[in-house]
Swiss-Prot record:
Catalytic activity: cytidine(34) in tRNA(Ile2) + L-lysine + ATP = lysidine(34) in tRNA(Ile2) + AMP + diphosphate + H(+)
UniProt source species: Rickettsia felis (strain ATCC VR-1525 / URRWXCal2) (Rickettsia azadi)
Designated name of the protein: tRNA(Ile)-lysidine synthase
Pfam families: ATP_bind_3
GO cellular component: cytoplasm
Gene: tilS
PANTHER family per record: TRNA(ILE)-LYSIDINE SYNTHASE-RELATED
Similarity comment: family membership: Belongs to the tRNA(Ile)-lysidine synthase family.
Length: 430
């Protein structure tokens, strides 16, 4: 019975993807162990290569035991197992969020290396209920309260085939098949708000959980039928994103959309232009929306971006501030720099690296730069934007700025494209 429900879910979620490979994120907990066994049956039935990925966060003593256990199960099922390690660097600030991001970075990067397009995770019905309660406490809007069974991360599709299966059914499945699992001690700690909500839900009547699920479904329907199409229309009509890594928002067209969608549009642009993975909080975006309604020009900074109103348009471009992007050595044919730009070399170029333009560099080569196209496109903000673009150097010398076709030698040839690592539950930028 459980497998039939799982099979129906995964077939509906994947659709006509035509997969030959798939990966499953598996820890030692009951949810993901059940996912592994169910996914194995499905993969065998559909002649699909299943890879198993575990991430050790190096936070609990038994985590290595769990990874070893999953490796043994994978071996017994003739499935490849990959063990990854998250380095928390002894920084325990906002650890849950950082560990989650680190985990997904590691897993999706491995998927890209293995040419795997879909990653299965073990989020089940109880997780969705807890998430709804957490977001309700934070006064989230329609987008925040909604849930999704398909997400994107690092251009990998994240699929949750257990979304309508309660944890109790997964545990029952494991017990009936005499399959062992590990309990995470941190799940019983009052240190985390999620655990407190979980305990309250466990003590409540069944109708409370059923009512939350019903509310969630209503919100999801409203999002799918009204707000998601509106968001897509808003992006298509009001947003222009340029290869230089900046964007313009047409405020006249922007004005006709709902406030819920306006918040998402601003966040969409902030994530893409900043190269960050997380959206800005609503309380940070709200002042920008208020400024827009005042119909006066302004210049603010938020979320690693400069937001500059110029008449009826909003220009958004990268702001480095105190945190400059890391330099990247061009060892391979291409690299991603600042989580936004892909730089490709078309010839052997030893000892070169990608970095940002310094003021000293700019002074030395200023007279050789043709900034007219950038000046025209950016409403004369070229002098700021030029410092946000990738440049290629050998030692201390700038040899290329591909965006503006600057090369100090005819032998150099580099390509650059704007390729932000955009993460969203509602839209996918690829």
């Amino acid at each position: 019975m459980l497998y039939e429900k799982f099979e129906y879910n995964i077939n509906n979620l994947i659709g006509n993807f035509g997969l030959s490979k798939i990966a499953a994120a598996v820890s030692g907990g009951s949810d993901s162990v059940a996912l592994l066994y169910l996914a194995n049956i499905w993969a065998e039935k559909n002649n699909i290569e299943l890879s198993v990925i575990s991430v050790d966060h190096n936070l609990r003593e038994q985590s290595k035991q769990e990874t070893h256990y999953i490796q043994n199960i994978s071996n017994s099922l003739n499935r490849k197992h990959y063990s990854l390690s998250f380095d928390h660097q002894n920084n325990f600030s906002n650890l849950q969020e950082r560990a989650r991001e680190g985990r997904y970075d590691l897993m999706t990067n491995l998927c890209l290396e293995l040419d795997i397009l879909v990653l299965l995770t073990a989020h089940h019905e109880d997780d969705y209920v807890e998430n709804f309660c957490l977001r309700l406490e934070r006064n989230s809007g329609i987008f925040g309260l909604s849930s999704s069974n398909i997400n994107w991360y690092n251009n990998i599709q994240i699929i949750r085939p257990l979304y309508n299966i309660p944890k109790s059914e997964l545990v029952e499945y494991l017990v009936s098949h005499n399959i062992k699992w590990f309990e995470d001690e941190s799940n019983s700690s009052d240190k985390y708000r999620r655990n407190i909500i979980r305990q309250k839900l466990a003590k409540g009547e069944d109708y409370i959980k059923a009512d939350i699920i019903l509310q969630q479904l209503k919100i999801n329907d409203l999002l799918d039928n009204k707000f998601k199409p509106e968001l897509i229309s808003a992006i298509a009509e009001a947003v222009k994103i340029f290869e230089y890594g900046f964007a313009f928002l047409d405020l006249v067209k922007f004005d006709k959309f709902s406030n819920e969608v306006k918040v998402q549009i601003i966040n969409f642009l902030l994530i893409i232009i900043s190269g960050q993975f997380r959206a800005a909080r609503f309380y940070s975006v709200e002042p920008i929306l208020k400024l827009i309604t005042q119909d006066v020009n302004f210049k603010n900074t938020l979320h690693g971006c400069v937001i500059n109103r110029i008449q009826n348009e909003l220009l958004i471009y990268r702001e480095f501030g105190k945190k400059l992007p890391e330099s990247k050595i061009l060892l391979d044919k291409s690299v991603i720099w600042d989580n936004r730009f892909r730089i490709t070399r078309n010839q052997e170029t030893p000892n070169c690296f990608v970095t940002h333009l310094s003021l000293e560099d700019y002074k030395m080569i200023k007279k050789q730069l043709d900034l007219e196209p950038l000046k025209n496109l950016s409403c004369k903000n070229h002098n700021a934007i030029i410092f946000t673009l990738p440049i290629i150097k050998i030692l201390e010398k700038v040899i290329a700025i591909p965006h503006i076709s600057y090369y100090d030698n005819d032998m150099w040839n580099f390509e650059v494209s704007f390729a932000p690592n955009f993460v969203s539950r509602f839209t996918h930028f690829c």
